[in-house]
Structures are given as C-alpha cells and as structure tokens.
Amino acid sequence: MMNRIHAVILDWAGTTVDFGSFAPTQIFVEAFRQAFDVEITLAEARVPMGLGKWQHIEALGKLPAVDARWQAKFGRSMSAADIDAIYAAFMPLQIAKVVDFSSPIAGVIDTIAALRAEGIKIGSCSGYPRAVMERLVPAAAEHGYRPDHWVATDDLAAGGRPGPWMALQNVIALGIDAVAHCVKVDDAALGISEGLNAGMWTVGLAVSGNEFGATWDAYQTMSKEDVAVRREHAASKLYAAGAHYVVDSLADLSGVIAHINARLAQGERP
C-alpha cells in the first residue's frame, strides 16, 4: 500500500470552486479601472494566473498591450508604487466578492469523498493571499468542501508559484512520506510548474478553469465544436507547462489516480 498516491494538492479558483476562475480575473479588471482608470481585458487578466496577486498585477503591467496603454496615459511604465495602488484597490474588492464564487465545481464533492475513501489526504494552495482565503475557506466549507490543509500565496517567506513551496508546505502539514506519492492538480500553467518543481505528478484541468475561461452556464450551452476548440487550446497550454495528464475537471481525477498508482507500482516516478 505504500507505493501509491497518498495526497492530492488542489488549487482553488477554477479547480475546486469558481468554474471558469472568474472571481480573480474580473476583480483585476475592476481594480485597474478603479485605481487608474486604465482598461484591461478579461483575457489579459487571465494571462499570469497562478501568481500571487501583487506579482500578477506586476506581470499584467509588463504585457506589451497593457504597457502601451499605460505609457500612453502616464508617459512611463508601471512602477512598484502603481502596483501597490492597484493591489490596494484589488484587495477589498476581492475580499468582498470571493464568497460569491465559493460554490464547489460539479463533481468536486463526490471526487473528494472517493479519494478520501482510498485513504488519500486533500491538501490545497492558492494564488489568493491569506486575507482572501480566510473568507473563501469557510464559505466553501458551508457548501461541503473542506480540504485537510490550505496554504495562501503570502504565507511563506520563500514565496508562491511557480516555486514549489506551497505544495511542499502541504506535504509537511499532511505528513506525506514522499513527494512522488503526491499529485498537484491545477487549471493554470503556473500551478503545473509548481507541482513539477515540487517533484510531484501533475494534472491539468482543461475545462473547469482559467485557460478555458467560460462560466458554467456558458459551457452548458456551448456547441461541441466550440468546446473542442477551447479544450484543445487549454490542454495545449497545460501540456506545454509539463502536465503529466490533462482532464476536463476534478470529476475526472479518480481514473488518473488509478493510472498513476499503476505506474508507481512499476517503479515509475514523476
């Protein structure tokens, strides 16, 4: 029984809650507008997803199109003080609204129950800072999602993604004996990098999250052709980041775990 998966470490928005990862992306658009009356698109807001939120704003400012808009308005590129101001606008908006995006994605509760029935522990980490997570975690618990541990992007002095530290903090907290017995699941490329840097198996989610970028209602009414195109776009980004597996959503994870267990039994490692 030792040579098998002992823990999965799950992202939050777009992986376990908030189908399409809209809570953070919409707030970035609002924060840029509120702080400096600068417009960014939802697609631009999605590009650096997975970073801590201050670093996410910094990365947005470096996108060529956003930098061009900033230069046109202010005659210079975004400064650290500008990032601080946008972050200061972002935080209260995100804290106020994250609870509205706390419902588990379809299949999450059943999948977690199935994993726990196999003795698998449930860790989690997020690009959200602790102030946001302290609102999101209890709200998700009210809907039935309660991981065994969670780590926020600003909890650790070493930093957040794409570094391995949040994933490894879960390993420590959960008492897992080997990182090769862990699976990191994420809907964003940086979360896949995090898992790889931590020495874990990685599973990307192509439909439920940031790269697919649709609401649940929009997904339900989308044509098969549109779904296929968007799925392929998302999957290609996740595979390019190094994901060992890519599936649509967490509802598909149990079969992947069985496949990884078979590989572990044959002596394979991530």
Curated annotation (Swiss-Prot):
It comes from Salmonella gallinarum (strain 287/91 / NCTC 13346). It catalyses: phosphonoacetaldehyde + H2O = acetaldehyde + phosphate + H(+). This is Phosphonoacetaldehyde hydrolase. Keywords: Hydrolase, Magnesium, Metal-binding, Schiff base. Its cofactor is Mg(2+). Its EC number is 3.11.1.1. Involved in phosphonate degradation. Gene3D superfamilies: HAD superfamily/HAD-like, Putative phosphatase, domain 2. Mg(2+) binds at residues 11, 13, 187. GO terms for molecular function: magnesium ion binding; phosphoglycolate phosphatase activity; phosphonoacetaldehyde hydrolase activity. Binds 1 Mg(2+) ion per subunit. Disulfide bonds: none annotated. One of its GO terms (cellular component) is cytosol. It is an enzyme of class 3 (hydrolase). The active site is at 11 (nucleophile), 53 (schiff-base intermediate with substrate).
